[in-house]
Amino acid sequence: MAPELAARYPAIQTYAGQSLQNPAVSARFDLTPQGFHGLLLGSPVGKVVIEPVDAAAGLYASRTASSSASWSCTLPASTAKQPTVANRGQAAAFGSTLLTYRLALACTGEYATAVTANATPAVATTKLNVLAAMVTAINRVTGIYEKELAIRLVLIGNNDQLIYLSAATDPYTNDDGSAMLGENQANVDAVIGTARYDIGHVFSTGGGGIAALQAVCDVNIKAQGVTGLPNPRGDGFYVDYVAHEMGHQFGGNHTFNSVTGSCNGNRNRQTAMEPGSGTTIMAYAGICGADNVQSNSDPYFHAISQDEIRSYVLDTRTNYGGACPVYTSTGNQAPVVTAGASYTIPQGTPFTLTGSATDANGDALTYAWEQMDQSSQGGAPAAAATSTTAPLFRAFAPVSTGTRTFPRLTDILSNTATIGETLPTVARTMNFRLTARDNRPGGGGVGSASTAVNTTAAGPFLITTANSAITQAPLSTFTVTWSVNNTTSAPINAANVRILFSTDGGQTFPYVLAANTPNDGSQGVVFPNVRTSTGRLRVEAVGNIFFDINNADITLSGPLPVTLTRFTAAAEGTTALLHWTTAQEVHNAGFEVQLQGPDDQEFRKVAFVAGQGSTTQSQSYALRVPDLGAGRWYVRLHQLDEGGQTGSFSSVQSVLIRVPAVAASIWPNPLPAGQGTITVELPTAGTAQVTLYDVLGRPVATQPPLALAAGKTDVPLTLPAVPAGLYMWQLTVDGRPATQGRVLLRP
């Protein structure tokens, strides 16, 4: 909200956040008379939504999916002032400048009733409560736009003048989106003034979605945007629909390639780069019948949408998208991306693309590979297999690695095909874009690079052995066979292959059975000295990106290399005491000791204890793991065979480390001019340091470290000049986080 609007409605508060443990995760929160609402973006489980079930009772629900709704989105007669972008090359990086637009958001009386009196639980139909619902929606949308496009939306200072509480007296035709385009333009211009806003929109409960294309900053059409659903609340409304319709106003076209269901008649040829319904914001996820790739949109823009929107908002000519925003330097630098070389591969064969990026700010990056192809006509995703131009592969939400396998690994391992993951069966060129995001709240940095994959009539390249379940002994010999199918000839020229083995069902392939053997269709190998019931073989081209995995699990069974008879863990102060005993050992190199702490996401290696090789005598081992923090720690053993072959894992033991608590408080609170006292109580002597963080989790001030004795100590606190407001503080003792709190700084 603009400062003057926020001042009139102090009960409505919005927040932006970023995870300290995983900076790729960003958050938007709001606290209003209707409760707490939250959105997490970039989490390991995808988008997470937090919404009140009964705010008065403090009951909230979190979930990862949006609710579906019947939907119709249309564009009026073209208002585009410049050609749409269909560039397959590298897009211009951005993120160093934040573009802020003044949003005039109106509503019909029906919308006001829907989000108040007809809500669950019901609240009074007042401007405060309606504005609260609007703020929740725009806080979600601007959180996405800031991260994806470096665009911020701010509700204008007198936006409450556009809130209508009665359907009988509002100036809108609630169920007619086309009519409301002109009605909203006229009303916002009259009530607010043409020069006092940059983009206008109206919420309703009918009429679907409709918006003028390339409307932002254009005095003739900038308020022509409508979003209306019978239930205009929840993340399905905010992300799938509001962000979508505003995307049109910022210059984004539809990205789906389907022509069935609601997709029929709404496809845009130049930007139809997503198979089926598509999954990104400017697609039609869940409303294209048999071509639905998934039920709801993911909260990010396809690369072609970023191209279109950024092209429009950087055009500073009169009535174009760059003519009216406020430009603010963010200090951020966009990632620099490398997509890798182009390759030629056989048709009908899986492949993997790998790229990378660097970030001058050291931000945690996420990556998304997307196909950048479009055909003259739309069609079913499966039909793209025989097309030389249609998009084959869907978009997936950005992940922490620059590697993507086509089709997705789960399809390969299960021998199934899903919508939007189709291998080509003809010779063609596939164009791909790797986009890297730094996910910074307040203006995300985005960079990209492109590459191409060419398929030929050769192929498919397929493993022809172990395609049904088999059982072998560890260290046994086995002949792997595969169909070469002209992959040694030009232009593929794959003279050699690498043969790998997996023990986890094909998720990873740590065992090299043949590093560089001729691509002649047959090779004898020796299985590793491991036991597994979920083994898989992978044959991949050396110096190329294509491969195949056999279709069924391979079982390797035989005597265990180590018989573990006892494994215990106990606490002694801040040390974990580990003891274990073996009955026999066969080719045992030793034990990797792995630990997982209270704040760890996975186990990590902390020590290695050498084994006894081969022996039939009982052996005892012990290890002390010192300097553990408070909390429950988990420990396991990873036995390794001689030669570096991985063996088996032990059971997991837990140790509860109890450390006397550290207490601290800053007073007075509020703190005038950064001057006050911090009282610290330590169980033992240590070096303490206080760091101040802003609401985005960025450190803004740090006190010099102080050596303190055990017990309670009052330490003068002097913080450098920082703006007044609410801050988080954290106390570290001997370099470890000990406690934290909040402090309000006054001028």
Kindly label every feature range from the protein language model.
Residues 156-179, 218-299, 370, 374-380:
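The catalytic-center signature of Zn2+-dependent metalloproteases
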Residues 1-52, 179:
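N-terminal prosegments of processed precursors
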Residues 345, 356-361, 438, 483-490, ...:
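Extracellular acidic, Ser/Thr/Pro-rich low-complexity tracts
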Residues 381-418, 423, 511-515, 590-630:
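Recognizes extended acidic, P/S/T-rich segments that occur
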Residues 557-662:
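Short, compositionally biased serine/threonine- and acidic-rich segments at solvent-exposed termini, linkers
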Residues 59-216:
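Fold-level signature of zinc-dependent metallopeptidase catalytic domains
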Residues 610-634, 704-736:
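Short, surface-exposed loop/turn motifs with a glycine/proline- and acidic-biased composition
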Residues 642-660, 678, 702, 716, ...:
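C-terminal tail/sorting-segment detector
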